[in-house]
């Protein structure tokens, strides 16, 4: 179910403050955040946001196509290493 339009997008206040400061100072360093639940706003375009995936911060460059999505969608939390090889086949 999508979020109601009358509520508006959710962005953590501390993240919004960091982004506004980075835009005002034209800082190119990644903005480090743990807030995967925050929505990408148009003010974020052109910034690099380091989103925490549970282990490390993954740098995500924000483009106009990402607006409206959540930051957590761009920092994967699980790594798939493939299914284990079948033991019966290796007996040859």
From Swiss-Prot:
InterPro entries: Ribosomal_uS19, Ribosomal_uS19_bac-type, Ribosomal_uS19_CS, Ribosomal_uS19_SF. The keyword RNA-binding applies. The gene is rpsS. One of its GO terms (biological process) is ribosomal small subunit assembly. This is Small ribosomal subunit protein uS19. Disulfide bonds: none annotated. GO terms for molecular function: rRNA binding; structural constituent of ribosome. Pfam families: Ribosomal_S19 (PF00203). GO terms for cellular component: cytoplasm; small ribosomal subunit. Keywords: Ribonucleoprotein, Ribosomal protein, RNA-binding, rRNA-binding. NCBIfam families: rpsS_bact. Protein S19 forms a complex with S13 that binds strongly to the 16S ribosomal RNA. Belongs to the universal ribosomal protein uS19 family.
């Amino acid at each position: 179910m999508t979020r109601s339009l009358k509520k508006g997008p959710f962005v953590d206040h501390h993240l919004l403050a960091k982004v506004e400061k980075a835009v005002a100072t034209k800082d190119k360093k990644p903005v480090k955040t743990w807030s995967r639940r925050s929505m990408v706003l148009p003010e974020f375009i052109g910034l690099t946001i380091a989103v925490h995936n549970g282990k490390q911060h993954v740098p995500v460059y924000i483009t106009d196509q990402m607006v409206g999505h959540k930051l957590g969608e761009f920092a994967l939390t699980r790594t798939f290493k493939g299914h284990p090889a079948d033991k019966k086949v290796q007996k040859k």
